[in-house]
Amino acid sequence: MQAASVPVAAITALQGLRDKGKIQAGQKVLVNGASGGVGTFAVQIAKSFGAEVTGVCSTRNVDLVRSIGADHVVDYTKEDFTKTDQRYDLIFDLVGNHSFSERRHILNPNGICVMAGIGGAGWHDGMGIRLAGELDAYVRSRFVSQKFISYIAQFNKRDMMVLGDLLQSGKMTPVIDRTYKLNEAADALRYLEQGHARGKVVINLE
């Protein structure tokens, strides 16, 4: 069951942090959307690289995000992480609910903001819009020393092996919110659409 919850979300987190974000030990990393399917993997993967991790989530998920390794947790219902004096080397943004300038404000001068398939303030549906967002992020980043990168993860066997090693070593554990039967798939989708899933939602095919 845990293995079934890994591939897409964990690869998205791994490639975003390692390949796009160039994560290094000792860096200060912020994960916006830390309690979701990708975010729970991102927190653990960032910790495996030796980063100091801050997770952003709602009140009900604070303990969860702390339990998977976050050094600091920001409750977005009580505090806006873009309105503090804290600066980060890497922002892994899975929500996109802040403007370009707000994200610039909390990045170090040579910091990187990685957006998983988003290019502005808010999620966008459709491949064309996502690619437009990627181009927009690239053009903007040419005018500042900070980098803003939007991407879509690519599945490959090599990264699956990396993730397998993290699972076996105990450095990464899938967080499963709910499990549905195949004939309950519609219910699972409705739950996901609410945007409040903690970790992954799994459909059991047996």
Where are these regions (language model features)?
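Terminal helix/beta-alpha structural elements that buttress the NAD(P)+-binding lobe
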Residues: M1-E206
